[in-house]
Amino acid sequence: MTFKPELATHTLEAEGLRCPEPVMMVRKTIRNMQDGDVLLVKADDPSTTRDIPSFCRFMDHQLVGQATETLPYQYLIRKGLEA
């Protein structure tokens, strides 16, 4: 999975927040986006490496990229399953 932050149409800074806050903020932000929009999430909570991919599967969004080797962790989430 290649990480391309330039795909993002929205950004969410979730650094300093701890579980469950990052995923709650992702859900709230995505709710206000259009299908096909891409959210860049920046977080430093280790639980996001598990929680954000699970959120995408459960809520039918696409995790189109992630960079979790260094802090902050970064995720690209496309709203909906259709590109």
UniProtKB/Swiss-Prot annotation:
Pfam families: TusA. GO terms for cellular component: cytoplasm. PROSITE patterns: UPF0033. GO terms for biological process: tRNA wobble position uridine thiolation. Keywords: Cytoplasm. CDD domains: SirA (cd03423). The active site is at C19. GO terms for molecular function: sulfur carrier activity. The keyword DNA-binding does not apply. It is found in: Cytoplasm. Belongs to the sulfur carrier protein TusA family. Sulfur carrier protein which probably makes part of a sulfur-relay system. PANTHER family: SULFUR CARRIER PROTEIN TUSA, SULFUR CARRIER PROTEIN YEDF-RELATED. This is Sulfur carrier protein TusA.
